[in-house]
Amino acid sequence: MKIAVMTDSTSYLSQDLIDKYNIQIAPLSVTFDDGKNFTESNEIAIEEFYNKMASSQTIPTTSQPAIGEWITKYEMLRDQGYTDIIVICLSSGISGSYQSSYQAGEMVEGVNVHAFDSKLAAMIEGCYVLRAIEMVEEGYEPQQIIDDLTNMREHTGAYLIVDDLKNLQKSGRITGAQAWVGTLLKMKPVLKFEDGKIIPEEKVRTKKRAIQTLEKKVLDIVKDFEEVTLFVINGDHFEDGQALYKKLQEDCPSGYQVAYSEFGPVVAAHLGSGGLGLGYVGRKIRLT
């Protein structure tokens, strides 16, 4: 038995990790109103993306990997001698990535594809990838890995803040926000992932209060966990994320693992300006 681990590009793993563990990536893409399309790899730097999004008349659209892209990756790994592939995907609540990866797995012969819905995005999705790789190295079988990830999902989540809900509403990536329409003038929304979907949690007066709310909600959840990994996931307001990261490093118990990452273009397109996330995992994830 030989097991590969792959994911889509919204896990936002560093290139060092991708190279070290030979992780295959199925890229999502973004398209702007001028027709220019970029796959989520090295085709567009995140700073350039935010600048282009700010100057566009409409929000960019995003596309999941085509089934054919998944099939090509699966067949390549099969031809390299892999018998099983663990595939970690962006939440099915905001993307068709999981469904297309699963369907592609049904169409490929000679290799067993095990698609897993992270129900999250960004580096919290990436934590599932790193956990799966660790378990492969320890000799676990595919179903044992999927079972462990499923258990881990019960103690994993994320809260988000954005400047406004415009991008999320126009892209259809937020659930249950209708009652908030027209009520957010001078207010900042606090959001969370719930069962794979982004839903409104609270609205507060200032961005400072929103960040404090983000921190309090997550720390209240993890306070009884035996192990904790926290990820600050930053958007285009760089100083906000850096300040939160530094504060958590200073204030959290010594046993907490606090890490930092950034949103890539696809998730940033949905969140819009001012996105900032704080994710948590009830495990100590190997991050190197």
Curated annotation (Swiss-Prot):
High-level lineage: Bacteria, Bacillati, Bacillota, Bacilli, Bacillales
Organism's domain of life? Bacteria
Which UniProt keywords are listed? Answer: Lipid-binding
Protein name as it appears in the record: DegV domain-containing protein
Tell me the ranges covered by the DegV domain, including all copies: 3-282
Q: What does this protein do?
A: May bind long-chain fatty acids, such as palmitate, and may play a role in lipid transport or fatty acid metabolism.
Q: Which InterPro entries match?
A: DegV, DegV_C, DegV_domain_contain
Q: Supply one GO molecular-function term.
A: lipid binding
Q: Where, by residue number, does hexadecanoate bind? A: T62, S95
- Which SUPFAM superfamilies does this one have? DAK1/DegV-like
Q: Which NCBIfam families match?
A: DegV, fatty_FakB1
- Species assigned in the record: Staphylococcus aureus
